[in-house]
Amino acid sequence: MTQVESWRKVYSDVVGEKVSLDLNIFSDNYDEIIFFGCGSSYNLSQSASFFTKSLLDGRSCFTLPSSELLINTDIYINKDKKYLIVGFSRSGETTESINVVKLLKDRQNVTSFTFSCKEGSTISKFSDYHFICKGAAEKSIVMTVSFSSMLIAYCLMLTKLLNNKDMLNEFKNLSNYLGENISKLFDDVEYYIDKNNFSSYFVVGSGFNYGLAVEADLKMKEMSQTPSYSYHLYEFNHGPKSLINKESLCLILTLSKSLFKTEEIIKEILNLGSKVLLVGSKDISIVDSKNIDYLLSDSNFKFDIIKSFINIPIFQILAYIKTIKKNLNPDKPKNLDYTMVI
């Protein structure tokens, strides 16, 4: 299943109520919501956590790698508080994530809600609530469609619970926009890589985009074996910029109107010799340089947090094409397995 097809199916399942969902799970008065996962699933957890804070008026929530929650359980789980733990695992068979749910299953103050892409998974059997993104589990070791599908499924559920019809409609438009542009996007990215070789890769993003930046870094690193790094937008100036040179590419994820002095940051990156690739509209940050290019510059979304989803196919395609150009197999990265079982 392609990314566009998967997003449309998830939308139909969640918003069209083709799958039975008990959205009251979000309505309970939890003291904290903890998101967890491993690898790419941990990265999407960071964005899911920010989305939750944004829609639930700063509800207390945070993100942990599954292993951290597993080995330091009593530090993060207080017996006097009520928790919702939300976990993500493509296969539903990742050892650390399963063990988190099993460990906390009998605690009366903890409710678990997990997402996976395969039916009958072990994690679903131990979870209080579970959602399956059917058809989103790619055969490749690398998570692409499954990553975005689980993230968009969670975000749609929360949006539906709040009955935010404007956001739900924009999520629908998101799938249509991607469907109209995906073929051209492949061509544009390949053309860009052919014209702009790079040996190091930086991705910066703030808020919801930080989790995506870490995932973009991971995709390039694991697939193409290119040294890659990810940072919050404004943290990039506090040390990491020392690594930039003329052989670098800096991918700047979609900018929101709430950000400040982005032009200065972009200009400094350019002055250090790096090439810059910016996702989204030019009207937010106008910088004139032969070393800056834009992708999906015609994108126009009312909600910045939904616009952020257009970053995902871009950084996945960038990593894929870079890998192909280096004569590596994008589906079987070095030293990696489909599911981590310990």
Specify the residue positions occupied by each region the protein language model found.
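N-terminal amphipathic/basic leader segments beginning at the initiator methionine
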Residues: 1-8
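Glycine-rich phosphate-binding loops that contact phosphosugars or nucleotide phosphates
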Residues: 28-175, 206, 241, 249-301, ...
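Active-site phosphate/pyrophosphate-binding segments
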Residues: 8-29, 129-251, 259, 326-342
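Peripheral docking tails and interdomain loops at the edges
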Residues: 300-342
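Conserved phosphate/anionic-ligand binding catalytic regions in large, soluble enzymes, centered on
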Residues: 35, 41-48, 213-215, 219, ...
